[in-house]
């Protein structure tokens, strides 16, 4: 229910009964009003009231809520480690199921319908849609279950704040893409090769039908990825500390892309999306932002490049004479492409400025839940066998981009 926490995120009073503490540390009974005039129910934690970028902030500036009632001091690092470990290996199981189903898809369909089927565009996109989104994702939700899950207090995010977040996304994408491209270039030069994922993705996007891009990249991918890396992870780990949950969600999301080109901006976006989800309690906001980013980069930008003939340019790389002739013919269209890139750069710059200003003015803040792990939280989240297996899988993904494994 909106505004309520379930399971283990109930404040306990000195008698061990479900109670509430307002910011002043008062133990409020059901039906009582806090300082802000909120009528709190059992199991509900009052939110501070000063307006911030997302959600609310405390009346005393940006300080955290204070719990003055005697509370049993426990070391929550062990249950925290277990909670993170469970989510990390379950995400690995999702990846394993998707990989196995993709292998079966790539072997089974040509065997049934002939080898020519691999040249059909729907076959290529179907390798993502069917194994990852239609099979592996529902199984992941089933495996994830509801153990340790809490319900985060919900707040509305206005249109203005959503647009501010869009600009921040543009800034993160711009900076992250530059960092990722530079590292990918250096690694490619050292390995005397190019990233397989990057080349494959470029060819797939430039030669694709807009319908498949919108369906897969613009709609399905944001829904599935936000449900896995934001809602599923955070609902089960945020009670041990918002900061660790946000960082872990974002970094795992970035690493899961499996290449340097996308890793850094995806991690940055993941951190921002995780923060927004924790402050609003509504996954639809991060999904809509994720859709906006993907539709802009993979649908609008790619559509403009297709219109300008960049797919034909890619096909003529081995014929310099024909390429030069074509470049002269499509020069006006190329100028339009560069104009679009200029617009994206301006949006990215505005986003970077907004992030810097928001950080300087402390618009981003964290709230300490009752089971917050002050020390050793990051170690508990990252030093466990679930994360070890996840990182081994990630290393394989990154290495396979530059090394051709002949299995």
Residue ranges and their predicted role:
Residues 114-116, 121-170, 174, 185, ...:
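Membrane-helix interface linkers and caps
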Residues 118-123, 154-221, 235, 399-407:
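Juxtamembrane helix-loop-helix connectors linking adjacent transmembrane helices
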């Amino acid at each position: 229910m909106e505004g309520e926490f379930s399971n283990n995120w109930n404040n306990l009073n000195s008698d061990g009964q479900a109670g509430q503490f307002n910011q002043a540390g008062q133990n409020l009974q059901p039906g009582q009003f806090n300082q802000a005039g909120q009528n709190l129910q059992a199991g509900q934690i009052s939110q501070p009231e000063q307006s911030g970028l997302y959600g609310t902030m405390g009346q005393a500036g940006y300080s955290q809520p204070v719990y003055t009632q005697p509370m049993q001091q426990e070391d929550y690092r062990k249950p925290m480690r277990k909670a993170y470990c469970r989510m990390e290996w379950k995400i690995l199981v999702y990846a394993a199921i998707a990989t196995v189903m993709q292998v079966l898809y790539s072997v089974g369909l040509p065997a049934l319908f002939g080898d020519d089927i691999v040249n059909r565009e729907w076959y290529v996109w179907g390798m993502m849609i069917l194994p990852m989104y239609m099979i592996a994702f529902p199984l992941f939700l089933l495996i994830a279950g509801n153990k340790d899950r809490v319900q985060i207090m919900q707040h509305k995010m206005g249109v203005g704040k959503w647009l501010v977040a869009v600009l921040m996304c543009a800034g993160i994408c711009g900076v992250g893409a530059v960092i990722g491209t530079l590292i990918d270039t250096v690694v490619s030069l050292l390995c005397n090769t190019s990233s397989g994922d990057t080349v494959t993705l470029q060819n797939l996007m430039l030669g694709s039908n807009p319908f498949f891009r919108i369906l897969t990249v613009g709609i399905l991918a944001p829904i599935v990825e936000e449900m896995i890396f934001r809602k599923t992870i955070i609902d089960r780990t945020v009670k041990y500390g918002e900061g660790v949950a946000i960082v872990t969600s974002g970094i795992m999301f970035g690493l899961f892309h499996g290449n340097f080109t996308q890793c850094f901006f995806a991690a940055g976006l993941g951190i921002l999306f995780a923060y927004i989800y924790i402050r609003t309690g509504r996954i639809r906001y991060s999904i809509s932002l994720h859709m906006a980013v993907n539709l802009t980069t993979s649908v609008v930008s790619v559509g403009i490049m297709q219109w300008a003939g960049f797919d034909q340019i890619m096909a003529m790389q081995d014929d310099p004479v024909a390429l030069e002739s074509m470049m002269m013919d499509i020069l006006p269209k190329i100028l339009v492409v560069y104009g679009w890139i200029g617009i994206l750069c301006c949006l990215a710059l505005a986003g970077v400025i907004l992030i810097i200003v928001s950080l300087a003015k402390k618009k981003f803040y964290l709230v300490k839940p009752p089971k917050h792990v002050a020390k050793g939280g990051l170690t508990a989240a990252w030093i466990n066998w679930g994360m070890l297996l996840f990182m081994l899988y990630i290393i394989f993904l990154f290495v396979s981009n530059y090394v051709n494994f002949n299995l």
